[in-house]
Amino acid sequence: MHPMLNIAVRAARKAGNLIAKNYETPDAVEASQKGSNDFVTNVDKAAEAVIIDTIRKSYPQHTIITEESGELEGTDQDVQWVIDPLDGTTNFIKRLPHFAVSIAVRIKGRTEVAVVYDPMRNELFTATRGQGAQLNGYRLRGSTARDLDGTILATGFPFKAKQYATTYINIVGKLFNECADFRRTGSAALDLAYVAAGRVDGFFEIGLRPWDFAAGELLVREAGGIVSDFTGGHNYMLTGNIVAGNPRVVKAMLANMRDELSDALKR
């Protein structure tokens, strides 16, 4: 096992255990709004602290980028840990048992290690660049769909970017005519992990942040899939507009989305 994967798994499990314990005691959860339709809890912050502490013990010099604390610069800028301590906070607050810890390690701009941990199902999705993706140690392969016929597509509403609501609904309408059904679960990290596992055939979302998809992107790639922006390029790290699936599914999704995109979403 890659030494950084070992630490990422340890950190994810520790944070996941903390989250699961707090899920059982909802009276101890304190939620607040940090932005439009964007929530944070004391559990997000406590889970983040556990992850940072675990990383710092082994790699004190590395840079850490987190959803709640921003960038914590280390002396080694080439190695960045990109963390979402609780992806699916709204689900957690509402006691919907679908959320995850997401940890990725980027070295010189390339994601090398990924962990997405679902503490409620005890499902640990892991990947190391060039060595495949696993779920609880078993090798993952994505969907073998050849087109959109019969596919299940996952997505997330652009609740932080409602200016795109009409465009988004138009894209959904276009894809709905081609696929079998949609799933909207509330955790982009798990959506991407499910693409890697073949549980859903494709995924798209507008305006994600790097910590939402950094780990999931590598899971998809290592399970034989591809990830692109809405025009088939690689600008999603900047825009957060992301499409994922096997190459044929992504190609078909992009073809259906193309005519519905506003200029802002073509970047």
From Swiss-Prot:
Q: Name one GO molecular function term.
A: magnesium ion binding
Q: Does this UniProt record's set of keywords contain RNA-binding?
A: yes
Q: What is the effect of changing G173V?
A: No growth at 30 degrees Celsius, IMPase activity not inhibited by RNA polymerase (RNAP)
**Entries under SUPFAM superfamilies matching the protein:** Carbohydrate phosphatase
Q: Which CDD domains would you find in this protein's record? A: IMPase (cd01639)
The temperature dependence reads: Optimum temperature is 80 degrees Celsius, 90% of activity remains after heating at 70 degrees Celsius for 5 minutes.
- Chain positions recorded as substrate binding sites: E67, L86, D87, G88, T89, R183, D212
Cofactor details (free text): Partial activity is seen with Co(2+), Ni(2+), Mn(2+), Zn(2+) and Fe(2+); in the presence of Mg(2+) these cations inhibit.
The EC number(s) given in the record are 3.1.3.25
Q: What induces it?
A: Transcription is autoregulated. Repressed by the Nus factor complex (NusA, NusB, NusE (rpsJ), NusG and SuhB).
The record's annotation in PANTHER family points to: INOSITOL MONOPHOSPHATASE, INOSITOL-1-MONOPHOSPHATASE-RELATED
* Protein name, per record: Nus factor SuhB
**Species of provenance:** Escherichia coli (strain K12)
